[in-house]
Amino acid sequence: MTTLGMTMLVLLLLLPLATCLGDGERSPWDSLLRALRSDPQACEPTISGGEMICRDEVCASTGCNCGYNIAKAHCYCACP
């Protein structure tokens, strides 16, 4: 294995540890991982009383919020 390959392997192994360390603030990696976990199709819309309501269970399980895009008429997971 090349030196570059070994360096990449070590960095990948240390990445989870780096996200756990710190002063309790969210790291940029947390936001990235949350964005990757959020599925645009996860919060399916339901119609109640003629209004479109986005279900929030799946988004909330990943720490995100379910939103409704009026222009595109669909629900989506929004991660802070």
Curated annotation (Swiss-Prot):
N-terminal signal peptide: 1-20
Chief location of this protein within or outside the cell: secreted
Tissue: Expressed by the venom duct.
Propeptide: 21-36
GO molecular function: toxin activity
Modifications the protein undergoes after translation, according to the UniProt entry: Contains 4 disulfide bonds.
Localisation: Secreted
Gene Ontology cellular-component annotations: extracellular region
Keyword set, alphabetical order: Disulfide bond, Neurotoxin, Secreted, Signal, Toxin
Domain text: The cysteine framework is XXII (C-C-C-C-C-C-C-C).
Name of this protein: Conotoxin Cl10.1
